[in-house]
From Swiss-Prot:
GO CC, any one term: cytoplasm
SUPFAM superfamilies for this protein: Nucleic acid-binding proteins (SSF50249), Translation proteins SH3-like domain (SSF50104)
Provenance organism: Methanococcus maripaludis (strain DSM 14266 / JCM 13030 / NBRC 101832 / S2 / LL)
Predominant location: cytoplasm
Function summary: Functions by promoting the formation of the first peptide bond.
Protein's name in the database: Translation initiation factor 5A
InterPro entries referenced in this protein's UniProt entry, alphabetically: IF5A-like, IF5A-like_N, NA-bd_OB-fold, Rib_uL2_dom2, Trans_elong_IF5A_hypusine_site, Transl_elong_IF5A_arc, Transl_elong_IF5A_C, Translation_prot_SH3-like_sf
Localisation: Cytoplasm
Modified-residue entries (Hypusine), positions: K37
Gene expressing this chain: eif5a
Annotated family: Belongs to the eIF-5A family.
Keyword Cytoplasm: yes
Keywords from the UniProt entry: Cytoplasm, Hypusine, Initiation factor, Protein biosynthesis
Pfam families named in the record: IF5A-like_N
Length: 131
């Protein structure tokens, strides 16, 4: 499952995902402001990239549309550790994937079960499920 779907900018909340400048990001902060008597509300989003540590901001009318990535959360088993990469097998489809070793997830070793997600044709290991 890859791609995006449109969503209203004013409906986004902290913790949801959004695409800013072609980069899938997690919303860290939102600020709504109404400029005055004549004018629509504006929304300022601050977001952090999912796959790369980059901070993004977006400002627009609350009624405007913005792309939201379709995220597929899956489970896999670590088959091998290969330096800066991890080879995992999907537990539903049994396909093998080679993903970059995450720096923010502890306890990755051969044989452990992990949760990973796919968004916009990219993959990331998010947590260790069982050791």
């Amino acid at each position: 499952m890859a791609g995006t779907k449109p969503s209203e900018l004013g409906a986004l909340k902290v913790g949801q995902y959004v695409v800013i400048d072609g980069i899938a990001c997690r919303v860290m902060d939102t600020a709504h402001s109404k400029p005055g008597k004549h004018g629509g509300a504006k929304v300022r989003l601050t977001a952090m990239g999912i796959f790369e540590p980059v901070k993004k901001e977006h400002v627009g009318p609350a009624s405007s549309r913005i792309d939201v990535p379709l995220i597929d959360k899956r489970k896999g088993q670590v088959l091998a550790l290969m330096g800066e990469h991890v080879q995992i097998m999907d537990l539903e489809t049994y396909e093998t994937l080679e993903l970059p070793m995450p720096t923010d997830v502890e306890g990755i070793d051969s044989g452990v079960e992990v949760e990973y997600f796919e968004a916009m044709d990219r993959y990331k290991i998010t947590r260790v499920i069982s050791k």
